[in-house]
């Protein structure tokens, strides 16, 4: 990934398959400024599939010819950031916030490269952590612990409010955080689906959630309380 991208507070490097032909969402006379949207699919080591919303402009591909190569079925390598935007008047199955990958560099992998899904975000907690235990249990019979966070990440394009999920020891560490605390989170981007029930509607809607799954959390507050993040294990 480009070194300038790596130094920022919001970065993602990911490899996946384009599932739909990119369509134009913002036209421009200059090919570099045309904005496209499509879907990106990748398979986790566990076999579960993630499907993300992907946006890129012409300049991310490098040349006008390379834009044409980014089509359904090809594997691409992406360097960019995670962005969010409000959705006005969403449908029942839509979230109020659109969360997507914005590619600043996109290239067809030919030949294929090693798999990648690496995220780094740096920002401030903007909502109290939500700590809970799930119904599922570990191999030792203990309930799994989970903490959900929303991190406000500033950039020259505005502020993105990125959902994060932490498990196990990382969930315990994250639960000590408060609104306004500065954190650094390292992990991977993932999607998951759940059924959303709406009053007055008979069938539940299948809703997709996008979030950063934290492998490691850094925070001054965590260290002050003697809770070293190195004790956590990767998810």
Where are these regions (language model features)?
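Single-stranded nucleic acid-binding surfaces, predominantly the OB-fold ssDNA-binding core
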Residues: 1-235
């Amino acid at each position: 990934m480009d070194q300038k991208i790596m130094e920022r507070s919001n970065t993602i490097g990911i490899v996946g398959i384009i599932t739909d032909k990119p369509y134009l969402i913002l036209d421009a006379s200059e090919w570099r400024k045309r904005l496209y949207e499509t879907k990106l699919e990748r398979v986790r080591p566990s076999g579960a599939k993630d499907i993300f919303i992907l946006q890129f402009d012409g300049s991310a591909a490098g040349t006008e010819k390379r834009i044409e190569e980014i089509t359904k079925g090809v594997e691409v390598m992406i360097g960019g950031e995670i962005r969010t935007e409000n959705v006005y008047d969403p449908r029942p199955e839509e979230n109020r916030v659109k969360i997507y990958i914005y590619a600043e560099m996109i290239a067809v992998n030919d030949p294929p490269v090693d798999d990648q899904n690496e995220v780094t975000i740096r920002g401030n907690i903007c909502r109290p952590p939500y700590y809970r235990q799930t119904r599922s249990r570990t191999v030792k019979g203990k309930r799994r612990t989970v903490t959900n966070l929303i991190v406000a990440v500033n950039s020259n394009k505005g502020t993105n409010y990125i959902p994060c999920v932490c498990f196990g020891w990382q969930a315990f560490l994250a639960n000590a955080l408060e609104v306004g605390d500065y954190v650094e989170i390292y992990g991977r981007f993932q999607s998951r689906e759940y059924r959303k029930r709406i009053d007055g509607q008979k069938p539940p809607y299948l809703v997709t959630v996008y979030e950063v799954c934290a492998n490691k959390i850094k925070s001054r507050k965590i260290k002050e309380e003697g809770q070293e993040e190195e004790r956590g294990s990767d998810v």
